[in-house]
């Protein structure tokens, strides 16, 4: 059987697209994040993430809690160092666990946060929550800041539930960072990276 030699450079012009999370040389550029183990803290604020350099962002990470049975919440931060609370958060997340049971998390009218989980485990071998969140237009003061997310939680019995959905805050204002907070327990371990998405 004869071999066919391919010339992969023939007919190719320009530069092939690449993506590199670590070096920031592709379509995603790391703009910030946070990582720690063995903590006992009530919240995590990550500031100075969003600017006019990028319109949209990607957040990837995981969180472990110190004790069982706590929800994990997410709020926006302003460049003044204040956390956005109030009742402007609206969201709808649809989930399915490993037994095909359906679970939904939503805000019926308005809420003071995005709720990213039910009651989670504190087992260090199982992330309480791991997630991928796309954030749209956070630095544009004339638009709402919205999210589209996929996240998975392990509950107190290490049962996995995966959610997907979206949400937004009704205020048309610019935001600077993110604020993760459990509703009843403390954070122990976390590793979060935030990337700006290049337009071209």
Please identify what each model-predicted range represents.
Residues 2-200:
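Surface-exposed molecular-recognition determinants
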């Amino acid at each position: 059987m004869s071999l066919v030699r391919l010339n992969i450079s023939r007919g190719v012009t320009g530069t092939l697209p690449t993506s590199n999370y670590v070096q920031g040389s592709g379509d995603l550029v790391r703009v910030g994040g946070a990582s720690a183990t063995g903590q006992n803290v009530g919240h995590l604020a990550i500031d100075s993430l969003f600017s006019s350099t990028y319109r949209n962002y990607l957040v990837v990470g995981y969180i472990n809690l110190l004790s069982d049975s706590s929800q994990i919440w997410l709020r926006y931060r302003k460049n003044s160092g204040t956390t956005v609370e109030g009742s402007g958060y609206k969201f709808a997340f649809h989930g399915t666990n490993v037994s095909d049971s359906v679970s939904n998390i939503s805000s019926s009218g308005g809420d003071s946060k995005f709720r990213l989980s039910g009651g989670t485990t504190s087992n260090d071998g199982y992330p309480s929550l791991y997630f991928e969140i796309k954030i749209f237009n956070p630095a544009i003061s004339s638009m709402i800041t919205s999210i589209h997310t996929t996240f998975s939680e392990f509950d107190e019995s290490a049962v996995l539930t995966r959610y997907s959905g979206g949400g937004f805050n009704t205020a048309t204002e610019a935001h600077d960072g993110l604020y993760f907070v459990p509703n009843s327990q403390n954070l122990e371990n976390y590793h979060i990276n935030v990337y700006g998405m290049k337009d071209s």
